[in-house]
């Protein structure tokens, strides 16, 4: 029998429990970033905040905004990932980057857990759209350093579907 939900426990949680879980995870994430990222420690300090000041979604507006320019400058100051990285660099398992069409590119560094969470979220989205293990997908996105191609491929595989990696490439 085919399961209706990809992640039944998370996708059928009561609204009150979901709100509490979101608040707990948000507070935990903000604390983690504050405790482990030099750039965000400085940004929070400038905003007269700590990693414990935002505990609910309604308070997200209080967080200091980060621009792409700041990320680029951070990566120039402290290559390759910048001082906004909140994980030890030896825990980085995958590296993507932006295209650089609006300036220099920005690296995105993922730990194994980051990649797993990304693939779980993507697979849940594909599952909600009706994708199932008996389906076959011709995947035509570009397999380069930007996140879309490979990430979508892995998300599709996580649903159990068969994936044909067709993607665009060098035609010479």
Identify the residue ranges that each predicted region occupies.
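Conserved adenylate-forming
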Residues: 28, 39, 47, 149-172
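Alpha-helix N-cap/loop-to-helix initiation residues
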Residues: 115, 145-146, 171
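Nucleotide 5′-phosphate-binding alpha/beta core
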Residues: 1-97, 102-120, 124-128, 132-133
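Conserved AMP-binding loop of ANL adenylate-forming enzymes
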Residues: 127-163
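Glycine-rich, histidine-containing beta strand-loop boundary motifs that form or position
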Residues: 110-111, 141, 167
């Amino acid at each position: 029998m085919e399961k209706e939900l990809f992640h039944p426990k998370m996708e059928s949680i009561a609204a009150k429990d979901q709100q509490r879980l979101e608040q707990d995870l948000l507070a935990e994430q903000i604390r983690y970033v504050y405790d482990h990222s030099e750039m965000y420690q400085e940004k929070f300090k400038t905003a007269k905040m700590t990693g414990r000041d935002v505990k609910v979604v309604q308070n997200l507006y209080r967080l200091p905004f980060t621009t792409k320019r700041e990320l680029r400058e951070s990566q120039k100051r402290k290559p390759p990932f910048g001082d906004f990285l909140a994980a030890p660099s030896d825990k980085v398992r995958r590296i993507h980057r932006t295209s650089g069409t609006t300036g220099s590119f920005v690296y995105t560094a993922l730990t194994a857990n980051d990649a797993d969470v990304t693939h779980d979220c993507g697979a849940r989205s594909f599952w909600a759209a009706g994708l199932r293990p008996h389906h076959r997908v011709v995947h035509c996105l570009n397999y380069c350093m930007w996140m879309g191609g490979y990430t979508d491929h892995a998300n599709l595989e996580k649903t159990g579907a068969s994936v044909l990696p067709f993607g665009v490439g060098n035609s010479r």
